[in-house]
């Protein structure tokens, strides 16, 4: 049973498809939609009930989707994921660490994470680029009743004909559209920090690499820094649009992209932090109220 915002937007986010694809090989699955019923802990609540042959409930599990792929059960059992790997919980402490050590944010990530973080980030970067490439090639209508047409390829072609002063903006826009349209179609993307805001980071980093010839290693370090900033918001506030509005999704994505871009251009830790702050504050107050529960309007349109 899907409750609240998870039920209201579940069709558009293909939540039911993900659940059925996962559980159907094990046993028959029935989805019950309860968009007007909100569970107490979080707007994105769901209950899994296992029934026997007599339709009697044998086990049930209530869990909440709190953003970026993370799950939580209730106030007594916080986020269900791997243990925290970062000793510091806010940007003030991390910025002070950078100033004391003379190191940057990505080096803090390197010290806290395992060595395979770079292999993981390489996979993330490859997935982001693949989503852009697929989105720029795809045409047609996005799934759902709105009949919204894909526009990334059209905007990309237009941007290539712009004068240099306008071309960068047009290209970044087309890249972001490409990834967002892939997400709306159920394609493979990276939560950055969420599915609804998945186009911002890839668009900015892809354009910077193509236009400025940044190496893959520099991009991976920028991703590490961006992830750190996103994690700070996730830990201290929320990246769930259902809980805090779009400011927690696109706003945080903009902050992450701003931090990454500033680092690529040689910004100091203080400048990187300030860039992220400005990126977030310009999105404060944005709500999450998608038409028909689809990640299309205003998420794309």
Where are these regions (language model features)?
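Alpha-helical support elements that line or immediately flank enzyme active sites
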Residues: 1, 202-213, 259-266
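Non-transmembrane, aqueous-exposed alpha-helical and coiled segments at domain scale
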Residues: 2, 12, 42-44, 50, ...
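Acidic, glycine-rich active-site loops and adjacent beta-strand->loop/helix elements
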Residues: 2-7, 19, 35-37, 223-232, ...
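N-terminal loops that bind phosphate or other acidic moieties
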Residues: 18, 35-37, 54, 192, ...
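C-terminal regulatory domains involved in ligand/effector binding and gene-expression control
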Residues: 20-22, 28-162, 170-171
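Accessory "access/gating" subregions that flank catalytic or transport cores
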Residues: 129-245
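Hydrophobic alpha-helical bundle architecture
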Residues: 233-301
């Amino acid at each position: 049973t899907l409750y609240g915002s998870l039920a209201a937007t579940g069709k558009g986010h293909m939540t039911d498809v993900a659940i059925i694809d996962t559980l159907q090989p094990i046993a028959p699955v029935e989805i019950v939609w309860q968009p007007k019923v909100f569970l107490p802990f979080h707007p994105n609540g769901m209950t899994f009930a296992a029934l026997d042959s007599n339709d009697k409930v044998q086990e049930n599990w209530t869990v909440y989707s709190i953003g970026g792929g993370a799950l939580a059960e209730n106030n007594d059992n916080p986020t269900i994921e791997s243990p925290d790997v970062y000793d510091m919980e806010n940007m003030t402490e991390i910025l002070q660490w950078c100033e004391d050590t003379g190191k940057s944010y990505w080096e803090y990530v390197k010290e806290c994470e395992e060595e395979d973080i770079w292999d993981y980030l390489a996979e993330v970067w490859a997935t982001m680029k693949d989503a852009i490439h697929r989105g720029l090639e795809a045409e047609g209508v996005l799934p759902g009743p709105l009949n919204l047409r894909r526009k990334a390829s059209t905007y990309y072609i237009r941007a290539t004909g712009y004068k240099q002063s306008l071309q960068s903006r047009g290209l970044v826009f087309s890249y972001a559209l490409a990834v967002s349209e892939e997400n709306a179609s159920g394609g493979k993307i990276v939560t950055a920090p969420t599915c609804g805001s998945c186009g911002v980071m890839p668009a900015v980093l892809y354009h910077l690499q193509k236009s400025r010839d940044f190496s893959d290693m520099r991009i991976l370090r920028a991703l590490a820094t961006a992830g750190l900033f996103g994690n700070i918001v996730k830990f201290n506030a929320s990246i769930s649009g259902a809980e805090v509005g779009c400011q927690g999704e696109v706003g945080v994505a903009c902050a992450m992209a701003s931090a990454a871009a500033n680092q690529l251009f040689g910004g100091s830790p203080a400048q990187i932090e300030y860039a992220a702050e400005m990126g977030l504050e310009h999105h404060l107050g944005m709500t999450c109220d998608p038409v028909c529960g689809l990640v299309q309007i205003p998420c794309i349109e």
